[in-house]
Amino acid sequence: MVQVARMVKLTLAAALTTAAVAACTGPGDAAGSGTAGPTTVPPTSARDSARPLSQAGAESVTPDPRVGALFLGDTTTHTCSGSVLASTTGDLILTAAHCLLDGVDAAFVPGFGEGGGDAWHVEAVYLDPRWIADQDPRADYAIVRVAGGKGAGLLAEAEGGLTLGSAPAPGSSVTVTGYQMGEGGGALACRGTATSSQGFPSLACGGLTDGFSGAPWVSGSTVTGLVGGLDGGGCDDDVSYSPVFDDRIARLLVRAEAGGPGDAAPEALASDC
């Protein structure tokens, strides 16, 4: 397993380098082939916790089938997190825009945990024009169409998706669930109170290290943010940020549901961390 750095975001190039060094040889085609990463992911030995979530730091939890790990390239190392969206097409997930790069294959495994899981391969990526233009951190989100799996469909496998909502009001309670970067490893989650800092939703919650980028901020069954935005989610693993969810991400969902060609994901600019 890789050693996890002490801040949420690596640049994508660094994450890919770390993944390539750390990963065992796994199945899958080369980057850019159109078939992403592993077809199935081996099981993990994570220990889950039935305790109530702490507001102080992330703890082991039973995997949420609506939340999963994102694998880049031909490796068994997951580098980001993501979530299944409730959609008319039933094949859309949400993650951070800085987790993706055009020409690098990716696969998403919902509910990643002890039993491993089936990989859903990225087919198209839909991005806010502000991210395409200059990687505006306020638009650090991506809605992704996936295909594959072996069940009745992504929503069935995920036991339903998360409804896309608006940015959390300051003082509201949110739960963040995701995965630290590495091979294997179980789901971690933390509950905290949303605030606002420098124009971004923020959340004080320890342990949200590399790999949590793209992890959803959830209230009930609604996703109101994700780990990303300012400095790719934050330079300190005790405080995380989210891009602002507003009418622009809602329009992006409508576009993704309509289908059609996706966007070429640019490499994220280096953070100021």
Predicted feature residues:
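Structural recognition of the beta-strand scaffold that forms the well-ordered cores
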Residues: A69, L92-L94, A142-R145, V174-V176, ...
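Charged, amphipathic alpha-helical segments
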Residues: S49-S54, G90-L94, L155-G161
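Chymotrypsin/trypsin-fold serine protease catalytic domain
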Residues: P137-G211
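Catalytic nucleophile loop of clan PA
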Residues: G207-G228, G233-G234
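Conserved catalytic-core segment of clan PA serine endopeptidases
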Residues: P52-P65, G73-D74, A106-A152
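Catalytic histidine site
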Residues: E59-G113, T193-S197, G228-G229
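Protease-domain processing segments flanking chymotrypsin-fold serine proteases, especially trypsin-like
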Residues: V2-S87, F245, R251-C273
